[in-house]
């Protein structure tokens, strides 16, 4: 009996121990499960935070792009050639919207015509210019008509330079300004708050001020499309003045073919080459030629019949003995003035150094971008890419700042004023 009691006691202790272990194990399993659950929850929280941050970033990027797109649309709305009753308000709205952007948002502005450069590019101090839109004109007005430029420094030096020379020469006449490019007028107004008259505004201003005698001096290079549009606009106002006269553009009469040149073309050829060699550090065109340097004068080009003027300027250079002077055009009209054609001419003539300079009244967008820009299709880049030249340099200066050219306009204006008394 005693032995059975002992065995029962041992069995009872063993069973109790087993039950204790089982209970311990049962309690241990939930502890491990809790740790796993905590880890999973922490991971989910981190992923949720990352997702939220990514969503916030995406939302911020969308908001930035939306703000930039709004400005681009406002710029495109004023990048037009027609002025409307809404133009002034649109110019103001576009500038205010641009100013409200962050620097990062400004870099995102991209539209059909819009880019960060529209408002962001530094083209000089607009306050140095004079829009010449004052009233109290008097009886005699000298209206200077230009295509225009949004480059502030060029506008002040080239266009204002001509206007100032005319005002000095004719103090009894009030010099006023008109631009024919509404796109440029809007750009300058929106960016710089400078208000320049278009043709209709300038002529309406003259009528409202009681002008009796109107002389119009275009700064255009030739009798091209811009000149034709200007004369058509003036024709509609002729009966509102006692007398009207239109002066010759810079290069005077066109002539029948490339061999026909005149004193105006000779004067301009001499003026631009004198300035070019001086800027380049040479004594003369001949000295530059001996040093292997060619000058390429880049005009705009036109499909108008007046494009023969460019060939006439090439003839004029040759008549002056300038074997290292070449005339080209941005538009490649006439065809022999296209960049590729000019590169071939300069190469065949044996010149290894090239200096590009605009054959334009103002050194504006064409001079800065089409001629001297860094893009692959600029003239500077194409001359360099040809591999035919040791150096390619640019002189970004318009014709309007050259004294001899300004005096040529003074002479043209004198002829127009004199015609009023004949």
Task: Annotate each PLM feature.
Residues 12-18:
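Bacterial N-terminal signal peptides
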Residues 1-10:
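Bacterial Sec-dependent N-terminal signal peptides
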Residues 30-62, 117-118:
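Ser/Thr/Gly/Pro-rich low-complexity, disordered linker/stalk segments of secreted
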Residues 60-123:
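Beta-rich interaction/scaffold domains
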Residues 22, 98, 361:
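Short, glycine-/Ser/Thr-/acidic-enriched flexible segments
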Residues 117-355, 360-422:
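Extended amphipathic ligand-handling, pore-lining, and cofactor/metal-binding catalytic surfaces
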Residues 18-35:
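Sec-dependent signal peptide cleavage junction
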């Amino acid at each position: 009996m005693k032995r059975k009691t002992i065995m029962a006691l041992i069995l009872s202790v063993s069973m109790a121990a087993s039950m204790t272990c089982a209970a311990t194990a049962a309690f241990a399993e939930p502890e491990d499960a809790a740790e796993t659950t905590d880890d999973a929850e922490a991971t989910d929280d981190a992923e949720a935070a990352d997702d939220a941050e990514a969503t916030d970033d995406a939302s911020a990027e969308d908001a930035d792009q939306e703000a930039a797109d709004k400005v681009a649309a406002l710029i495109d709305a004023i990048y037009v050639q027609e002025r409307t009753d809404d133009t002034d308000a649109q110019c103001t709205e576009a500038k205010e919207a641009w100013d409200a952007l962050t620097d990062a948002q400004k870099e995102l502005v991209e539209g059909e015509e819009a880019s960060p450069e529209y408002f962001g590019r530094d083209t000089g101090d607009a306050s140095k210019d004079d829009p010449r839109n004052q009233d109290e004109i008097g009886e005699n007005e000298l209206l200077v008509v230009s295509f225009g430029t949004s480059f502030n420094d060029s506008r002040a030096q080239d266009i204002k330079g001509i206007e100032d020379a005319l005002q000095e020469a004719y103090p009894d006449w009030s010099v006023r300004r008109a631009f024919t490019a509404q796109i440029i007028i809007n750009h300058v107004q929106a960016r710089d708050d400078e208000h320049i008259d278009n043709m209709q505004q300038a002529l309406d201003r003259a009528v409202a001020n009681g002008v009796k005698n109107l002389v119009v001096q275009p700064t255009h290079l030739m009798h091209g499309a811009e000149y034709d549009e200007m004369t058509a606009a003036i024709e509609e106002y002729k009966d509102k003045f006692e007398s009207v006269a239109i002066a010759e553009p810079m290069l005077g009469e066109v002539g029948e073919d490339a061999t026909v040149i005149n004193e105006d073309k000779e004067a301009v050829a001499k003026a631009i080459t004198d300035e070019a060699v001086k800027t380049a550090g040479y004594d003369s065109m001949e000295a530059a030629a001996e040093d292997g340097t060619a000058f390429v004068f880049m005009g705009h080009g036109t499909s108008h019949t007046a494009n023969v003027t460019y060939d006439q300027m090439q003839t004029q250079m040759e008549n002056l003995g300038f074997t290292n002077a070449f005339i080209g055009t941005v538009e490649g009209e006439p065809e022999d003035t296209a960049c590729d054609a000019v590169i071939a001419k300069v190469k065949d003539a044996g010149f290894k150094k090239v200096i590009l300079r605009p054959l334009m009244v103002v050194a504006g967008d064409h001079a800065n971008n089409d001629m001297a820009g860094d893009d692959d299709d600029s003239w500077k880049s194409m001359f360099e890419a040809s591999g035919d030249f040791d150096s390619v340099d640019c002189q970004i200066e318009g014709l309007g700042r050259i004294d001899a050219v300004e005096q040529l306009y003074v002479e043209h204006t004198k002829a127009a004023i004199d015609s009023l008394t004949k």
